Regions:
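Bacterial Sec-dependent N-terminal signal peptides
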Residues: 1-21
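Extended alpha-helical scaffolding segments
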Residues: 89-199
């Protein structure tokens, strides 16, 4: 979580995304949304990990800061979710990389959070296999983000129980980590910006 503060202090030195390519590939995708080549180009241009994602789509109150990417976050993330031609394993790995190290926050991180949940419901077997291949600490980081809720409800609880019941035999250790994350982060966090303000 401390990384978020560091990035907020000076994102330029960390930004590795070609935003011109990202924006141009998004515009091309809008013209041909079913094109597998346009989908792949946009997918490849999209941030590959949480650090780059945060630096690309973050909000900054500093005078003169260009908020065009912040404003484009929702449309870009929805477009990413619509890239159905991308190999499922590749797509799930990308969502895992975007989630590991992430903190719940308004706008872009919240949109990402929703996309990861939607894809988990559609491709849980692939998600779980990909997660089982990464280090246990990074598994915990994924579940931390995935299960973070400021105020959770019955739907979240039923989703957790369903996933846990479905995979506890195949991935017992990972389901233990998932349960720990649920206990601590579901109804147990604030948006990270609110947390910093409350210190």
């Amino acid at each position: 979580m401390l990384l978020v503060g560091l990035f907020a202090a000076s994102s330029a030195q960390f930004l590795h995304i070609d935003t011109a390519r990202l924006n141009s590939s998004y515009r091309a995708l809008l013209k041909e949304p079913q094109s597998s080549s346009m989908q792949m180009e946009f997918f490849n241009a999209f941030p590959a990990n949480w650090n780059d994602f945060y630096c690309t789509y973050r909000f900054c109150e500093k005078d003169g800061y260009d908020l065009s990417m912040y404003d484009a976050a929702y449309e870009h993330i929805e477009a990413l979710g619509g890239c159905t031609a991308i190999n499922d394993t590749l797509f799930c790995k990308r969502l895992i990389a975007l989630s590991v190290g992430a903190s719940l926050e308004v706008d872009a991180p919240n949109y990402l959070h929703g996309l990861v949940h939607r894809r988990m419901k559609q491709k849980s077997d692939i998600f779980m296999y990909c997660l089982s291949q990464i280090e246990r600490g990074h598994q915990m980081q994924f579940w931390q983000f995935y299960l973070s809720r400021i105020v959770g409800g019955a739907t979240d609880k039923s989703e957790f129980k369903a996933l846990h019941a479905k995979y506890k035999k195949k991935y017992p250790d990972m389901m233990k980590r998932m349960a720990v994350a649920y206990e601590n982060f579901h109804n147990g966090v604030l948006f990270i910006s609110d947390f910093y303000r409350n210190l």
